[in-house]
Amino acid sequence: FLLGAANIPPHPLNLINFMEMIRYTIPCEKTWGEYADYGCYCGAGGSGRPIDALDRCCYVHDNCYGDAANIRDCNPKTQSYSYKLTKRTIICYGAAGTCARIVCDCDRTAALCFGNSEYIERHKNIDTKRHCR
């Protein structure tokens, strides 16, 4: 079993950070994984119009990462950053305008948005070809 685990690529550090932010902001009965295939934009890719407020959070996050990727040498999916979870909010550290700070702010904004948006069960695992045009 352990030898097989060695072949599993590690999660990028910022994905782990983002998952921790989400866990901090969402109701305890939901796991971060329940957001991975929700609506038209939560999860890999995205198309069409967001189907609700929660999906809109993911749409904004995707666009934020797209903007960050336009910064020289900035890969938002692998960029590490520093942050603190405190008093029901998230604080990002680092100089404004740096890749790390921008990516942290993208994740922070999305996680807080998730915490303020209703999770609608029927929008999980939707037929994206039909609903996301």
Swiss-Prot record:
It is an enzyme of class 3 (hydrolase). CDD domains: PLA2c. Residues 6-13 form a propeptide. Heterodimer; disulfide-linked. The A chains have phospholipase A2 activity and the B chains show homology with the basic protease inhibitors. Its cofactor is Ca(2+). Keywords: Calcium, Disulfide bond, Hydrolase, Lipid degradation, Lipid metabolism, Metal-binding, Neurotoxin, Presynaptic neurotoxin, Secreted, Signal, Toxin. The active site is at residues 61, 107. Expressed by the venom gland. This is Basic phospholipase A2 beta-bungarotoxin A-AL2 chain. GO terms for cellular component: extracellular region. Residues 1-5 form the signal peptide. Belongs to the phospholipase A2 family. Group I subfamily. D49 sub-subfamily. Binds 1 Ca(2+) ion. Its main location: secreted. Disulfide bonds join 40-132, 42-58, 57-113, 64-106, 74-99, 92-104. Its EC number is 3.1.1.4. It comes from Bungarus multicinctus. Ca(2+) binds at residues 41, 43, 45, 62. It comes from the Eukaryota. One of its GO terms (molecular function) is calcium-dependent phospholipase A2 activity. It is found in: Secreted. SMART domains: PA2c. It catalyses: a 1,2-diacyl-sn-glycero-3-phosphocholine + H2O = a 1-acyl-sn-glycero-3-phosphocholine + a fatty acid + H(+).
